[in-house]
C-alpha cells in the first residue's frame, strides 16, 4: 500500500463504547477463518432444473454434453422446451457413458425401451426432430438476412440466383 498505513485497528466498532479501548488486545474479536465448504451450506444450486442444458437469450433451449474420450463438447441442438433438451442430453449421455450416466430422467431408459417396437426405427424419430429444429433455425436465419437486406435464395429462378453476389465475383 505505497506508504499508506493500515488503520483498521484504530477504527472502533459499535460494540466498543469509547475510542480509548482501541488497540487493547482484550477488546479485539478473534475471527475464525471460514472454510469454503461452510459458506456453501451443502450442495450448489443449479441455474437450470436439468443437466446439460441452458436457455438462450431468445428463449430456446440448447443442449450439449462433454465427451470424455475425445475431450470435447458435443452439440446436441436447440429445442423449444427444457424437457426436450434434457431428453436429448439423456440419450447422448447413455450413448457416451452407458449405464453409469447421470440422467435428467432416470426412468427414461426403461420408457424408451418399452416404446420401441420391433421393426420401429428410433433414428427416424431423431432425424425428424433434427429436421424440424434445422428448419426453424433456417427460418430464423432468413428473417435475419431479410432484416439486413441480404439477398436470400427463396423460390427464385436459376438466373436470379446466378445474379447474387458471390466471393468469386469480387476477385
Curated annotation (Swiss-Prot):
The modification Cysteine sulfinic acid (-SO2H) is found at residue 2. In presence of oxygen, the N-terminal cysteine residue (Cys-2) of ERF71 can be oxidized by cysteine oxidases, thus preparing the protein for N-end rule pathway-mediated proteasomal degradation. Under low oxygen levels, Cys oxidation is prevented, ERF71 is stabilized and confers tolerance to hypoxia. It comes from the Eukaryota. GO terms for biological process: cellular response to hypoxia; defense response; ethylene-activated signaling pathway; positive regulation of DNA-templated transcription; regulation of root development; response to anoxia; response to water deprivation. It is found in: Nucleus. Its main location: nucleus. Residues 37-48 have a biased composition (Basic and acidic residues). Residues 16-48 are annotated as: Disordered. This is Ethylene-responsive transcription factor ERF071. The gene is ERF071.
Amino acid at each position: 500500500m505505497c506508504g499508506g498505513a493500515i488503520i483498521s485497528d484504530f477504527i472502533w466498532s459499535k460494540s466498543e463504547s469509547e475510542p480509548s479501548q482501541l488497540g487493547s488486545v482484550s477488546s479485539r474479536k478473534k475471527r475464525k477463518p471460514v472454510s469454503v465448504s461452510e459458506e456453501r451450506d451443502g450442495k450448489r444450486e443449479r441455474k437450470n432444473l436439468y443437466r446439460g442444458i441452458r436457455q438462450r437469450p431468445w428463449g430456446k433451449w440448447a443442449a450439449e454434453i462433454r465427451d470424455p474420450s475425445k475431450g470435447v463438447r458435443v452439440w446436441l441442438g436447440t429445442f423449444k422446451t427444457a424437457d426436450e433438451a434434457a431428453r436429448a442430453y439423456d440419450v447422448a449421455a447413455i450413448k457416451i457413458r452407458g449405464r453409469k450416466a447421470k440422467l435428467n430422467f432416470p426412468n427414461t431408459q426403461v420408457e424408451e425401451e418399452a416404446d420401441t417396437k420391433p421393426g420401429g426405427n428410433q433414428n427416424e424419430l431423431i432425424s425428424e426432430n433434427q429436421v424440424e429444429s434445422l428448419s426453424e433455425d433456417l427460418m430464423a436465419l432468413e428473417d435475419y438476412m431479410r432484416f439486413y437486406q441480404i439477398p436470400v435464395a427463396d423460390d427464385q429462378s436459376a438466373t436470379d440466383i446466378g445474379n447474387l453476389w458471390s466471393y468469386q465475383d469480387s476477385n
